[in-house]
UniProtKB/Swiss-Prot annotation:
Keywords: Activator, Biological rhythms, Cytoplasm, Isopeptide bond, Metal-binding, Nucleus, Phosphoprotein, Ubl conjugation, Zinc, Zinc-finger. Its main location: cytoplasm. This is Retinoic acid-induced protein 1. There is a cross-link at K794, K884, K1394 (Glycyl lysine isopeptide (Lys-Gly) (interchain with G-Cter in SUMO2)). Disruption phenotype: Haploinsufficiency cause obesity and craniofacial abnormalities. Homozygous mice die during gastrulation and organogenesis. The few surviving mice experienced postnatal growth retardation and most of them died before weaning. One of its GO terms (molecular function) is zinc ion binding. GO terms for biological process: circadian regulation of gene expression; negative regulation of multicellular organism growth; positive regulation of DNA-templated transcription; regulation of transcription by RNA polymerase II; skeletal system development. Residues 13-24, 201-217, 382-391, 524-546, 1486-1498 have a biased composition (Polar residues). It comes from Mus musculus (Mouse). A zinc finger (PHD-type) spans 1837-1885. The lineage of its organism: Eukaryota, Metazoa, Chordata, Craniata, Vertebrata.
Length: 1889
């Protein structure tokens, strides 16, 4: 409920916008189906849960805390892990807020009610602080059981139905009450006034998800959906209403009822609302009408998705928002991020999200709730008033009043009823839909109605466009969307916003963010001065402070506000097209929020905005677009945006308002992010700087964008970049600002994805960022890409509605929705990567650094062009284009804050003129994708990692490189982002005029290419690269497919392939250097970069000669290859900056998503998920070739990507690989299209299989390495399939798909080696395979981390290599390769076969490699690869490409989140290299994959490779790669199998064999390893089994040395000995303490009861005095029972072993003793011991490795021993703290054995304390040393205190003879020195040693 409510809060603004009307019909259709019932019921249940302890618990912390703090904390919490709990609890809080809210009426008040401020609103029962409020709400809930139950129910249900459940209960009410209530009308009326307050808090959230706010504002049904959340709001209002019977009581009661029982509540609500409508209609209508208009527009933007959703049944919608159904466009948009991204994390997050948002509301509304109330009702009240309004009614009324909302409107019953309505908004989804649609048709008229209908809360719901973002999702699936939207969807939509923006927590956070921003901003002139809609939006934004916590909320708010003016302005001014209008409306909806946020932020950043003021208008729009996309576009925007865009009823005034609002939006965003995060501050600083710079650039619009970009590089820049920036901005925001803002990437499209990042950034920027980033973002990939698309669209619309309209027009409404989805997906990709890069706030800091660095680069490259760009953007068309470019530039800018300006300018220059000249649709679309791509690629990657500088350097240098070669155009592309942006700009700006039609395809390509060139683009360029990133982000996986599609389009020109070889070298060398230098020293690589830019042009050229031949890349055919190469180079560059690569990868992913979106917007089917795999690639290709197919194919892809996005959370499970493949094929167009699509399908499936698994791990555990693995796998799959033009090969994927779903994890593990092998084999089947595999390996190695390096060496090789070899090399540049392959496919047959073969085989190997790395990651091998950026960099350098490549891939996939992004590219490169040798086997790739599956040989090879990788990864990564390479070559040659299914078998067979061999290695011939460890001693290690080889030896040795050294220092007797052995001898296993070694073993003698066991030291039983349990059994190493199977044998063996090994033990003991006495002894002892032990272990047989304990404890053996007893490890008793501490922690303390012989078993059990404190006893590597000696001494040593034998703890004072039992020493008062585990007797404890 909170989620919903928060959405409502956002939607409060949005509800004010009549935009809801736009989506009304759709939402209604969507919601009416049965969603109402389901939703309501579910919401009821959820409401119960929400309002029950869980919600309160989750949120009470949030609400109880000061609003701001709570908001932040809650947001964080909800971001981190409480997403479920906190989200939901927050939602209940929200509901509570709503309950008190009506009294408070402004949504912000409601939000405030959430926080401490809420008590004022709940005058009747003001509780202290937020908790009081919460309790109050709880009480109110109690009073109003329905809402209480409903929300609590939602809380419980929400976990599995985060949004669906959350929303459903309200939704059920909705259908009942909505249909009859027709609340849409009231909501529309009230939407302006009443929804505002509601939207401000919960209603906004409500609207956000249902259609209430965004969709509801668009459609009353949507509004009602929001009101479902608003139902929560109603509870919030109920505290108000309770006190204010007439006003608040009605609304709250009804709302609560609505929440609880949709029909009754609905009816009552309707009646009340109607009554209220009559009363407040005029007042509310007046102010709220405007607001409602804007709100609704924003909501309509949100309603964008409803078209998609509308088709969905309630169940479908639920599914949409359920992990499985997160495919549904609306759901994907609105909910997918949460569900799709990380079903568990996000869903829980979303669940918590509502609660968290409540806290945000609380934080934003309590601290900024007033402001937010204002902002929500900012329509009416001033933020201060809202915040200050203690009186629920007065406060709400005042804020509303201040916002020109009549006081009585707030206090009025109608307002209250509106609040109730708001609470019912979820339940009103259908009615709200209708109303919103009607409102969309008649914005003002309906707006008035809505004003009346929707009380401030409702208004809040509508006004809360940010929440409306969730709304977007909700309207998308109004019926189903609405119920989930109500709470879950609202949460999801909002969370989607947040997901996209900040993760599942984001919805609430963003809601609060918006509220907070608006609230904090309200005071800011911008929010108030913006426009009433903006004010409303500001209300949503609430306050910059809150925004800091919930930047996304603020952002959404901003969106809501921004779109109002900007969007209506642009919509009305730009296009008449209904689609555009829909988009405009959707934008407007978000514009309101954006405006609010913008105002809030602008006020905050007014200083920065002073110069950017002129720009803000244009910028504001883009931010709004982003925001709107985030909110509206996420759920509704994607689906509904097309629809809202269609209704051109968006009033021009709104549009105009939007412009104004946009203005502030950027600055506000910019400013708020600084507030939100520490990094934001730097960004903020940068922002002003950037602002100054950008304004300097010359275009007002671009300037603000850049400014925004600077602060929130992507987001603000998105403002300036309009269409392009929405994605660029969110990505940057995500990476930089989002974390800085809480949810600031509030651009719901980008914002959602970024919101996840931002929210993560806020609360758990790092933890959640990885998780949300990987999980949410993957989710975002579905919703966010749509949102991103929408946002992109909207932003572009804001900048140039024409472009947006063009984009929208490009595809039908549905197509548009799909496009939005697709774009959103792409954006997601970028955002995801941004998320990844943003994973750590430090990353953001580094981003700042990098951005500054990038800034310089941008200035270098973009300065000249930037100014022109800015100038160009000045023109409406140019600005759009410019915006897009600027978005990219902004991304670049983001990398370097200073750069943003230049970058923005540069992109703007490129974009602006072309955009104006070119068809706006394509241009806009391209712009959208372009900015998405660059933003994703550059900003995310660059901004996220500490390597940001490198990443940016990579990106910037790449773009710079392209810029140099391309001249002005290339120059624009030079910066990574800038390059991507410029690439797009070049396409857009330069070629746009040339290739207007192909511009869109070109742009996607450009997006891909620039990104590839930049580095993240690598993933895009590489079919695999994108998937890699997708995997990395989870969403990127979706994006990956899209990315692949996008990247594929870039490869239309086979000539480019040939050309490609050289550019990669150039780019690789130059860019690599740049990356390495960490500066934007990409200028030298401008040529290479130019290639990437050209690829963008090339793809365009493929589509249309002009584009291909544009200045950017005159040589279209040859250039594409070049571009591809460039992309690869970037890819390589990425590896160099592993971290950056990771981010870039996500960015790339995003960018591909953008591209795919463009291409795939038409595909709206759920199957698009499959298509996403193949469709994006294929469609990318097709789009490149055919512009027209792009929309259709794009649409298909759009859905597919959504599905994929969903699969991020539940992608794999929902759709079997086979099914996906089939769907993919089905969705594939005609012959060529089908073929391509099929090819893509296969990769998509492969990728998806790998991707979902990887994505899931990432999402669940925030394991960047696994996600990177996924991206590589996905990249490979994509690359393979896309590379393989032949669809036949792609067929393999389906089988794998089917199996993959079940054995996804296994497949993932196996896929790496299998695919690698397959690819290698495919490539290696020919005689040239050995070399080819080496190349692929190298490529993978060099592609991401060593993209530059590898390219330097391999890239050169590529050009150097003759036809086939260069081709192989080209494939090595997989980034390019994916597109290149497509290009090849399209172009020359010879090239095509080669390219295809290379791509396919390589792709497969890439996939295999990616999966292998993942497996390694699981094994922990990733340490070498995942962690090793260096290894990644090494990869290219090492001449062990095969094995290295797998390692590298593993590294890139695992270790590099960046490598993830780069990993995708890198892996594909590897694939390319591997398959390169078999150019003609592009099609055989699939069969090969299958073959791989089939033959055990292949499996074994794969496994061997994996094993080597695993084993060598940590230590022998380089050596292992050598072996692996040969193996891989063999595998490649021998395994022409499909890697899809064989992977599983390979994994099982190889893994098992491998593991067994490792563990047993019986055939291994023993040898003595002589190592000179120290100058003093020679260490001999007897290696009796492979497991004991150096690696294991060294590990135990070092740990032993460490332990022994530490222990020896502490040990009195063997101190010197131990130290020496530890230092010199100990490093060798034999050099471990020379004392007897005991290993923790299994309990062999079960006859020994615990009661009869005594400590072998003190002879006391367990728990004697305070000694605790006995630890053990410890066996002498020679007597250690052989594992469990050999336990029985062990008794027998122990006899012989004991006989043989006891002497050895004694010998060792003697040696140890002598070592103690003699320094030289340790050496002898060491040598002797190893020999003796070796012999002993040999007799022992297989058990000996485990028994080799002291001498050569194998890692395996050690781990086994350690595993036997967790406490035994890592503790050493010796003199040193570590050893001693280890010992204490371990079992050492409890090693009590019957005695040394201890019967047959030789079991020794000891008390931990005894072992730890006994001198000479220490635990090393799980082995207990000196225990036997200590036992011998203890037998005769009487205790000084009790005089009993067994005393082992001696006074450490020199000469002191006191010895005690540990308990006696305790009793005696001895002093225990834990530092070295020594003891001082009472006599000496005060004396110095």
């Amino acid at each position: 409920m909170q989620s919903f409510r928060e959405r409502c809060g956002f939607h409060g603004k949005q509800q004010n916008y009549p935009q809801t009307s736009q989506e009304t019909s759709r939402l209604e259709n969507y919601r009416q189906p049965g969603q109402a019932g389901l939703s309501c019921d579910r919401q009821r249940l959820l409401a119960k849960d929400y309002y029950s302890p869980q919600p309160y618990t989750g949120y009470e912390g949030g609400t109880g805390t000061p609003s701001g703090t709570v908001a932040t904390a809650a947001a964080d919490k909800y971001h981190r892990g409480s997403k479920s709990l906190q989200g939901r609890p927050a939602f209940p809080s929200y509901v509570q807020d709503s309950s008190p809210y009506p009294g408070r009426y402004s949504g912000e008040e409601g939000l405030q009610t959430w926080g401490g401020p809420q008590p004022p609103p709940p005058q009747p029962q003001p509780l202290p602080g937020a908790v009081s409020k919460y309790e109050e709400n709880l009480m109110k809930k109690t009073v109003v059981p329905p809402p209480n139950r409903q929300y609590p129910e939602q809380g419980p249900q929400l976990p599995f139905r985060t949004h669906s459940l959350h929303v459903p209960p309200p939704q059920p009410q909705q259908p009942l009450a909505y249909p009859k209530l027709q609340r849409q009308k009231p909501q529309n009326d009230l939407a302006s006034p009443l929804p505002f307050p509601q939207g401000s808090h919960f209603p906004q959230h409500s609207q956000s998800f249902p259609t209430s706010s965004t969709y509801a504002p668009t459609v009353q049904g949507g509004g009602q959906g929001a009101h479902s959340y608003k139902s929560c709001t109603a509870p919030s209002a109920q505290p108000h209403d309770r006190p204010m019977s007439a006003n608040a009581n009605l609304a709250p009661g009804q709302r609560v009822q609505n929440l609880h029982a949709y029909q009754p509540g609905r009816l009552g609500y309707e009646q009340q609302q109607q009554a209220l409508q009559g009363r407040h209609h005029t007042q509310e209508t007046l102010h709220y009408q405007n607001l409602a208009k804007y709100q609704h527009y924003g909501q309509q933007g949100q309603g964008y998705c409803p078209p998609d959703t509308a088709v969905r049944t309630p169940e479908q919608y639920y599914q949409t928002f359920s992990p499985s159904s997160s495919h549904s466009p609306a759901r994907s948009v609105g909910r997918s991020p949460s569900y799709s991204s990380t079903p568990s994390p996000l869903m829980p997050n979303l669940e918590n999200f509502p609660y968290s948002q409540q806290p945000l509301s609380t934080g934003a509304f309590p601290t900024g709730i007033t402001d937010h109330s204002h902002f929500m009702p900012l329509l009416n009240p001033s933020p201060t008033d809202a915040a200050s309004s203690v009186d629920p009614q007065a406060g709400n009324c005042k804020p509303l009043q201040k916002e020109k909302l009549p006081d009585n409107l707030l206090s009025d019953l109608s307002l209250q009823s509106l609040t109730a309505l708001t609470s019912q908004v979820e339940n009103i989804s259908n009615t709200v839909q209708q109303l919103l649609l009607s409102k969309a048709t008649m914005p003002q008229k309906k707006g008035v109605k809505n004003l009346v209908s929707r009380t401030p809360e409702q208004h809040k719901s509508q006004h809360c466009s940010p929440e409306g973002s969730g709304y977007s999702a909700e309207p998308a699936g109004t019926p189903l969307s609405e119920p989930p939207s109500s709470t879950p969807q609202s949460t999801h939509a909002e969370p989607q916003d947040t997901d996209y923006l900040s993760g599942s927590e984001d919805p609430l956070e963003r809601s609060f963010l918006y509220c907070s921003q608006a609230r904090g901003s309200p005071a800011r002139v911008n929010s108030n001065s913006k426009a009433k809609p903006e004010s409303v939006s500001t209300c949503s934004v609430t306050s910059p402070d809150d925004m800091s916590t919930k930047s996304d909320d603020s952002f959404q708010s901003l969106h809501s506000t921004l779109p109002l003016d900007s969007f209506s302005k642009f919509v009305a001014g730009e296009r008449d097209c209904p689609r555009l209008l829909l988009s405009a409306l959707a934008q407007e909806d978000l514009a309101s929020e954006i405006l609010g946020l913008q105002e809030a932020i602008v006020e905050k950043a007014d200083k920065a905005w002073a110069e950017a003021s002129s720009l803000p208008k244009d910028n504001g729009k883009p931010p709004f677009s982003l925001e709107n996309h985030g909110a509206c576009l996420d759920t509704v925007a994607k689906t509904s945006w097309s629809q809202p865009g269609e209704p051109e009823t968006l009033p021009e005034p709104l549009q105009l308002d939007k412009g104004g609002s946009t203005k502030d939006f950027s600055p506000g965003l910019f400013e708020d992010p600084s507030v939100a995060f520490a990094t934001t501050d730097p960004k903020k600083t940068s922002s002003p700087l950037s602002f100054g710079t950008k304004p300097l650039l010359g275009t007002a619009t671009p300037d603000p964008t850049t400014a925004a970009f600077d602060c929130f590089p992507d987001t603000p820049t998105a403002s300036s970049v309009d269409g392009a920036n929405p994605f660029a901005w969110p990505e940057e925001n995500l990476g930089d600002a989002c974390p800085r803002w809480g949810l600031h990437p509030g651009e719901l499209t980008k914002g959602l994805e970024q919101g996840a990042k931002a929210s993560d950034g806020v609360g758990k920027a790092d933890a959640h960022e990885a998780s949300a980033c990987m999980g949410f973002q993957e989710d975002h990939a579905i919703g966010k890409p749509a949102a991103a698309l929408s946002g992109d669209f909207k932003q572009q619309e804001a900048e140039g509605v024409k472009e947006e309209v063009g984009g929208l027009l490009q595809c039908p409404e549905v197509a548009k929705a799909n496009q939005w989805l697709e774009e959103s997906r792409h954006c997601c990709s970028s955002t995801d990567f941004g998320d990844l890069p943003l994973l750590p706030p430090p990353g953001r800091k580094e981003d700042l650094e990098a951005e500054e660095e990038y800034s310089s680069l941008c200035e270098l490259l973009g300065s000249p062009e930037q100014r022109p760009s800015l100038q160009d953007p000045l023109s409406p068309k140019a600005p759009l284009m410019c915006t897009k470019e600027e978005a990219e530039e902004a991304l670049d800018t983001k990398a370097g804050w200073v750069s943003p300006c230049h970058l923005s300018g540069e992109p703007a220059v490129l974009l602006g003129p072309s955009v104006g000249a070119q068809s706006k649709v394509q241009s806009w679309f391209e712009s959208s994708l372009s900015h998405m791509k660059p933003g994703e690629e550059g900003p995310e990657m660059e901004r996220a990692p500490g390597s940001s500088g490198t990443s940016q350097g990579s990106l910037a240098p790449k773009p710079n490189k392209p810029a140099v070669p391309e001249g002005p155009i290339a120059k624009k592309e030079p910066v990574p982002r800038g390059k991507s942006l410029r690439s797009r700009r070049v396409h857009r700006g330069l070629p746009e005029a040339e290739d207007s039609p192909c511009r869109v395809p070109a742009l996607p390509k450009d997006l891909l290419l620039p990104e590839s060139c930049t580095g993240p683009p690598q993933g895009q360029a590489e079919g695999a690269g994108a998937p890699g990133r997708g995997l990395s982000e989870g969403l990127p996986r979706m994006c990956t497919r899209s990315l692949t599609a996008l990247s594929e389009p870039q490869t239309p020109g086979p000539p480019g392939l040939t050309t490609t070889p050289t550019p990669p070298d150039k780019l690789g060398g130059k860019q690599r250097a740049a990356f390495k230098s960490g500066k934007r020293v990409g200028k030298p690589s401008p040529k290479a970069a130019s290639s990437p830019s050209n690829p963008a042009a090339l793809p365009v050229a493929s589509d249309s000669s002009p584009m291909g031949s544009k200045t950017k890349e005159p040589d279209s055919p040859s250039m594409p290859g070049k571009d591809q190469r460039s992309m690869v180079l970037r890819s390589r560059t990425k590896p160099q900056q592993v971290f950056h690569a990771k981010r870039r990868r996500p960015s790339e992913s995003r960018i591909p998503d953008c591209r795919a979106t463009k291409k795939l917007p038409a595909n709206n089917h759920l199957p698009t998920a499959y298509k996403v795999s193949s469709g994006p690639q294929k469609e990318g290709r097709m789009n490149q070739r055919v512009k027209v197919p792009k929309p259709g194919t794009g649409n298909k892809l759009s859905d597919r990507p959504l599905h994929t996005l969903k699969r991020k959370s539940a992608f794999m499970a929902p759709v079997p690989a086979k099914k996906r493949s089939l769907i993919l094929r089905s969705n594939n167009g005609s012959g060529g299209d089908g073929r391509e699509e099929r090819a893509e399908s296969s990769p998509g499936l492969l990728r998806r299989m790998a991707s979902p698994q990887r994505a899931r791990p990432r999402g669940s555990g925030e394991p960047p390495p696994p996600p990177p693995l996924e991206p590589p796998a996905a990249c490979m799959g994509l690359s393979t399939q896309s590379s393989l033009p032949s669809a036949v090969r792609t067929k393999v994927l389906p089988p794998r798909k089917g199996r993959g779903l079940k054995l996804e994890a296994i497949v993932q593990k196996i896929t790496s080696p299998g695919l690698k092998k397959l690819a290698c084999r495919v490539a290696g089947a020919p005689p040239g395979t050995p070399r080819s595999p080496a190349l692929p390996e190298r490529r993978p190695g060099g592609s991401p981390a060593g993209a530059e390096e590898g390219l330097g060496g391999m890239g050169q090789m590529l050009p150097a290599a003759s036809g086939a070899d260069p081709l192989c090399r080209n494939p090595a540049s997989r980034s390019l390769k994916g597109k290149l392959l497509n290009s090849k496919k399209l172009s020359s047959a010879a090239d095509c076969p080669k390219a295809e073969a290379f791509m396919s085989p390589e792709t497969l190997p890439s996939l295999g490699t990616a999966r292998a790395p993942k497996k390694r990651s699981r094994k922990g091998r990733t340490g070498t690869l995942g962690p090793s950026k260096g290894p990644l960099e090494k990869r290219p350098c090492p001449g062990q490409p095969l094995l290295l490549a797998p390692h590298d891939r593993a590294s890139s996939t695992q270790g590099g989140g960046e490598d993830n992004s780069s990993g995708g590219g890198k892996k594909p490169k590897t694939e390319e290299l591997g398959p390169a040798s078999q150019p003609p086997e592009g099609r055989p790739c699939q069969p090969q994959t299958r073959a791989q599956k089939q033959p055990g040989q292949a499996s074994y090879s794969s496994y061997s490779k994996r094993k080597r990788l695993s084993r060598g990864r940590g230590k022998t990564a380089h050596a292992s790669p050598c072996k692996g390479r040969a193996t891989r070559r063999r595998q490649q040659q021998v395994l022409p199998l499909d890697p899809a299914e064989p992977e599983i078998r390979l994994k099982y067979i190889s893994s098992c064999k491998r593991l067994r061999a490792d563990s047993r290695t019986p055939a291994f011939s023993p040898f003595v390893r002589v190592e000179k460890r120290d100058a003093y001693t020679t260490i001999c290690t007897v290696v009796n089994s492979p497991g004991d080889e150096p690696k294991p030896h060294w590990k135990p040795s070092s740990s032993a040395a460490s332990s022994s050294t530490s222990s020896s220092s502490l040990e009195p007797a063997g101190a010197s000995l131990t130290t020496f052995p530890g230092g010199s001898v100990l490093q060798q296993r034999p050099s471990l303490p020379l004392s007897s070694t005991m290993h923790l073993g299994p309990v062999v003698s079960k006859a020994l009861s615990t009661s009869c066991l005594v400590c072998c030291l003190c002879q006391n039983p367990a728990n004697f005095k305070d000694l605790g349990d006995l630890c053990g059994p410890y066996y002498p190493e020679h007597c250690l029972p052989k594992k469990k199977p050999k336990l029985k044998e062990k008794a027998r063996l122990e006899g012989t072993l004991e006989e043989a090994s006891l002497p050895l033990e004694r010998t060792l003991k003697g040696l140890e003793c002598s070592a103690s006495t003699t320094a030289a002894a340790p050496t002898t002892a060491t040598i002797t011991t190893p020999t003796a032990l070796g012999r002993l272990s040999r007799p022992d047989g297989p058990a000996d490795p485990a028994k080799q304990g002291p001498l050569r404890t194998s890692a395996r053996g050690l781990s086994r021993r350690l595993q036997s007893c967790y406490c035994c490890d890592g503790q050493g008793d010796g003199g040193e703290e570590v050893a001693q501490a280890d010992k204490s922690r371990k079992h050492e303390c409890s090693k009590e054995a019957p005695t040394e012989p201890g019967g047959d078993t030789q079991e020794h059990w000891v008390h931990e304390a005894c072992a730890v404190w006994t001198s000479g006893v220490y635990l090393v590597a799980g082995k207990l040393f000196g225990l036997q000696e200590a036992m011998k001494v203890a037998v005769d040593m009487p205790c000084t205190s009790c005089h009993e034998p067994g005393a082992t703890i001696s006074c450490s004072y020199k000469g002191c003879i006191h010895t005690y039992h540990y308990p006696c020493a305790n009793d005696t008062g001895c002093t225990f020195i834990e530092e070295n585990f020594t003891l001082k007797c009472p006599k000496h404890k005060r004396l110095p040693l």
